[in-house]
């Protein structure tokens, strides 16, 4: 491959600031160091050329590495200074093999911005898969890992990048780093397989969580625009860095929001440039760093991992002298004056003041209060007696009470989750969501009930006490965002469609207020609706849970107002049948006889 081609591939993931207009390759080569440099190239190649093999890419990476060295020489080639997106596309399009193998002919017939959009759209259509498919036994993985650590991690990056073309490269590399840490720990254990199975499940959960957060942010940006994203990020980072001033935080949030559109579109060149600019500027502000311990620690990370570190920061201690509560009424004259001239600034200041005082709150609780406060200010600030008007308008709205009430709600959910087995709690969620949206498919409701269980299980376990609220509501809101985006809400029912079109912070409350759908016309409840046979005698808990949930789904759809007592009766009969037939000599014959009886008895119960 010619130098132009090598250079193009190399700078696909150039993470340089706009001010570094010259010799971009040398700067990233210096900052990321050789291994980080090669990893970034690998992610970019794998994400954009999914039908190429690792063998196809290895020579390109080696040549690109050599080009990086030349770009840092005393006489760097002119190609080091060219536009990165144009270079990458030109290089790929000059290779008939790459174009044909990765179906890029249509894109390569375009030029300039049209070609860039085509490349981004092409990547967006590549199927995604979050699973870790390297299902070799731990012993084999450990042998490969110990034999050549870098090669093993490289193969992981290649496979994961191909399956997740829209994930920002820094996220892919953070995931690869985590997977390497799992192997480093487990390969030194006597029971490597047990260690690996346990840690892999935890690691997979962490991946799903991070991807859900990124997906939700993109969905929110697409549906609600910059204003809501800015409000979310202002809450998030004000909670993390309460020592920073409102002006400092507002400036930082503006830069964060500027990265969302390119990162969500799949334009990773611009995404990484914007992120690099953001992190560089934030980490260069010694005034903020001296007061924000978490940020200061993250800024000591290498260029590849700083951004992920900042996103994962825990809240710093609150500044000395900060009042426990924020009273919007105490300075209402100044608030109204600012609101009249620049309403977004006034609302940003209010959100900031609440957020720095309440790291135990979710973003949604603060935004719900802010929405009420905004309505009060709109109504009152032009009035002569605006102070009294605002007091009256917000008389029933208290942020501290909202936080307490929501925290108590999740604590009760945690208690309910702890009081029963994991399977029974998941089944109860299946019942709840089938009642309010019986039109949804089993697969949809299975996913929803599983997600709610996973969120509460993780948050109740990992975030005890008052921090359960931001953990649980953030994750459940992410799940709602994904559900409303992945499926046509109007195809489920008008109530769900209405809630999906509510304001961002009100979606979950809206769904919780939905009553069982009594207008749904269910299919006939008969034996053909269920398949219950010897497969129920398996010891696989997942298969058993799935079977139990399918029965509940069918029964509750038939009567969304069925009582809990009737459900318990049906569940008892189901387990009695299962125990009887699994103990029978001819299991199939037993199920053939008993399953229709169970369905018939269940049908009679739902008529009551």
Curated annotation (Swiss-Prot):
Top-level taxon of the source organism: Eukaryota
CDD domains xref list: ALBUMIN (cd00015)
Assigned keywords, A-Z: Disulfide bond, Glycoprotein, Lipid-binding, Metal-binding, Repeat, Secreted, Signal
Domain Albumin: residue ranges: 19-205, 206-398, 402-600
Gene Ontology cellular component terms for the protein in this record: blood microparticle; cytoplasm
Keyword Ligase: no
Family: Belongs to the ALB/AFP/VDB family.
Described function: Binds water, Ca(2+), Na(+), K(+), fatty acids, hormones, bilirubin and drugs. Its main function is the regulation of the colloidal osmotic pressure of blood.
Protein name: Albumin 2
Record organism: Salmo salar (Atlantic salmon)
Lineage of the organism: Eukaryota, Metazoa, Chordata, Craniata, Vertebrata
């Amino acid at each position: 491959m010619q130098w132009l081609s090598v250079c193009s591939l190399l700078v696909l993931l150039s993470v340089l600031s706009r001010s570094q207009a010259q010799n971009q390759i040398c700067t990233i080569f210096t900052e990321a160091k050789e291994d980080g440099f090669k990893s970034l190239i690998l992610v970019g190649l794998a994400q954009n050329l999914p039908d190429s093999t690792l063998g196809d890419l290895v020579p390109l990476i080696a040549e690109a590495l050599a080009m990086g060295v030349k770009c840092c020489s005393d006489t760097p080639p002119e190609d080091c200074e060219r536009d990165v997106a144009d270079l990458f596309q030109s290089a790929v399009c000059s290779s008939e093999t790459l174009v044909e193998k990765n179906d890029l002919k249509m894109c390569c017939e375009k030029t300039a911005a049209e070609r860039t959009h085509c490349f981004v759209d092409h990547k967006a259509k590549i199927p995604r898969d979050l699973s870790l498919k390297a299902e070799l036994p731990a012993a084999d993985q450990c042998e490969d890992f110990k034999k050549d650590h870098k090669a093993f991690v490289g193969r992981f990056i290649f496979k994961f990048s191909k399956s997740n073309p829209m994930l920002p490269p820094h996220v892919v590399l953070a995931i690869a780093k985590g997977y390497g840490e799992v192997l480093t720990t487990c390969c030194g254990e006597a029971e490597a397989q047990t260690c690996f199975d346990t840690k892999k499940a935890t690691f997979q959960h962490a991946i799903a969580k991070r991807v859900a957060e990124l997906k939700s942010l993109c969905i929110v940006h697409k549906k609600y625009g910059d204003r809501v994203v800015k409000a979310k990020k202002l809450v998030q980072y004000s909670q993390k860095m309460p020592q920073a001033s409102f002006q400092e935080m507002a400036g930082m949030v503006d830069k964060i929001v500027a990265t969302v559109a390119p990162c969500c579109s799949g334009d990773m060149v611009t995404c990484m440039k914007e992120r690099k600019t953001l992190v560089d500027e934030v980490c260069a502000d010694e005034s903020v760093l001296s007061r924000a311990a978490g940020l200061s620690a993250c800024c000591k990370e290498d260029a590849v991992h700083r951004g992920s570190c900042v996103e994962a920061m825990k809240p710093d201690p609150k500044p000395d002298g900060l009042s426990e509560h924020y009273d919007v009424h105490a300075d209402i004259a100044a608030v109204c004056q600012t609101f009249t001239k620049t309403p977004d600034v006034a609302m940003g200041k209010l959100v900031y003041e609440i957020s720095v005082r309440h790291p135990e709150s979710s973003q949604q609780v603060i935004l719900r209060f802010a929405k009420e406060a905004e309505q009060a200010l709109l109504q009152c600030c032009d009035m002569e007696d605006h102070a009294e008007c605002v007091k009256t308008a917000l008389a029933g709205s208290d942020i501290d009470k909202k936080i307490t009430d929501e925290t108590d709600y999740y604590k009760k959910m945690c208690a309910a989750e702890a009081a029963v087995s994991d399977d029974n709690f998941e089944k109860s969620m299946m019942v709840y969501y089938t009642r309010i949206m019986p039109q949804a498919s089993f697969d949809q409701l299975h996913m929803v009930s599983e997600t709610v269980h996973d969120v509460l299980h993780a948050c109740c376990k990992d975030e005890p006490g008052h921090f359960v609220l931001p953990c649980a509501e953030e994750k459940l809101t992410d799940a709602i965002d994904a559900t409303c985006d992945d499926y046509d809400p109007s195809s489920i029912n008008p109530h769900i469609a209405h809630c999906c079109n509510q304001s961002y912070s009100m979606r979950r409350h809206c769904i919780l207020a939905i009553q069982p759908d009594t207008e749904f016309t269910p299919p006939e409840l008969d034996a053909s609706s269920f398949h219950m046979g010897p497969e129920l005698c398996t010891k696989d808990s997942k298969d058993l849970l799935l079977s139990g949930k399918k029965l509940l789904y069918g029964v509750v759809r038939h009567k969304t107002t069925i009582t809990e007592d009737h459900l318990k009766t049906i569940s008892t009969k189901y387990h009695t049948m299962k125990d009887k037939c699994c103990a029978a000599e001819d299991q199939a014959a037993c199920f053939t006889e008993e399953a229709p009886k169970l369905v018939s008895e269940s049908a009679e119960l739902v008529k009551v």
